[in-house]
């Protein structure tokens, strides 16, 4: 049985790239390529898989209706899957106790956990606000794979 540390190790091996899957209202699966990383949940302190998602996407619509996600990372023949419930915070998904400044810092934390770097953080913050980006955190219920 794999652990979240295995996911974290593999995700670093491919620039944070992984496949995130949600359920559409008709029960079919919607998958997309995302950048993700492992970080501490800002409220619970548990280790979670985090990603930044553009506002208005099908992924966010699906997650609001059914807040569960599967994330798979693969490097070569090694892979790890994380399944779990999600927590969303963003301009269109406010959370009590997470103000605009906290969201700005959290967006940066998720981006860097996914291996991201930026030469102009003010520009990064501007784009995140303009795109109404949200933070999606997956709390692992099941972790499995061969990695």
Residue ranges: model-predicted function:
Residues 10-11, 63, 110, 138:
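A generic structural signal for nonpolar/aromatic side chains embedded in well-ordered alpha-helices
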Residues 2-6, 53, 119:
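Charged, amphipathic alpha-helical segments
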